[in-house]
């Protein structure tokens, strides 16, 4: 048998750290203002593309949920905080700094949701939470099914919010759209704005707004 040898030259290198920022907005709760619900996505992307699905879609979901709540005059019981995280792709610095600040300020975070799986048709949500909390969330399925949510399971929340769970044991939730086309685009040159469907993107925001409303209304 012949031996195949492959030679590869790469020119990647580590550069010195620079300053980045999370972008944070919130709607203050009217009944339990000290209880915080976080909704977010991350700002950065790989340099070979526009980051339209990863994670431009999550950023749009976050902003659209906030816009819709403000547009209808929704007054939450609990504080809803909208976070666009910095540096998810190669360091998780934004998520880590957010959790560290929450711990330092002794904030009470009851739930955190991230959208970081693309802007495709909604399919469900996944959790990092106790079996009891996942079971409680599943009782909401009939309310969300008309809008596309078909499943809720315990396969984990998002990466940016994971430090909240590690440091403060906050229950996590990840938005799960249809995954069939995600790896045609993920970290690839094809992850561009033209490959985002506006209707699918907005359906994701609808489902995220729905579960945030339920957590705000009933707690978690």
Please place each PLM-identified region on the residue numbering:
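Soluble metallo-hydrolase cores and metallopeptidase-like ectodomains found primarily
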Residues: 1-52, 64-71
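Surface-exposed patches in mature extracellular/periplasmic domains of secreted proteins
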Residues: 2-8, 149-156, 220
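Structural recognition of the beta-strand scaffold that forms the well-ordered cores
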Residues: 7, 23-26, 36-40, 81-84, ...
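Soluble non-cytosolic domains of exported or imported proteins
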Residues: 15, 52-60, 74, 89-93, ...
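Metal-dependent peptidase/peptidase-like ectodomains
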Residues: 32, 47, 85-185
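Extracytoplasmic/secreted envelope proteins and their assembly/folding machinery
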Residues: 59, 63-66, 77, 92-99, ...
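His/Asp/Glu-rich mid-to-C-terminal helical/loop segments that flank catalytic regions of hydrolases
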Residues: 67, 71, 182-220
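Phosphate-handling active-site elements
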Residues: 67-80, 107
């Amino acid at each position: 048998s012949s031996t195949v040898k492959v030679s590869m030259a790469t020119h990647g290198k580590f550069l010195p750290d620079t300053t980045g920022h999370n972008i944070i907005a919130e709607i203050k709760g009217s009944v339990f203002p000290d209880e915080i619900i976080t909704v977010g996505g991350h700002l950065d992307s790989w340099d070979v593309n526009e980051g339209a699905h990863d994670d431009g879609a999550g950023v749009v979901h976050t902003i659209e949920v906030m816009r819709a709540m403000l547009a209808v005059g929704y007054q939450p019981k609990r504080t809803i905080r909208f976070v666009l995280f910095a540096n998810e792709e190669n360091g998780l610095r934004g998520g880590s700094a957010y959790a560290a600040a929450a711990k330092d300020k002794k904030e009470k975070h009851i739930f955190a949701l991230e959208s970081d799986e693309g802007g495709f048709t909604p399919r469900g949500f996944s959790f990092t939470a106790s079996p009891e909390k996942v079971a409680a969330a599943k009782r909401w399925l009939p309310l969300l099914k008309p809008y596309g949510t078909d499943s809720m399971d315990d396969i984990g929340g998002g990466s940016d919010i994971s430090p909240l769970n590690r440091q403060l044991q906050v229950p996590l939730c990840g938005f799960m759209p249809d995954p069939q086309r995600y790896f045609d685009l993920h970290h690839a040159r094809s992850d561009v704005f033209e490959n985002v469907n506006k209707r699918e993107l907005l359906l994701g925001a609808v489902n995220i707004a729905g579960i945030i409303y339920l957590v705000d209304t009933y707690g978690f």
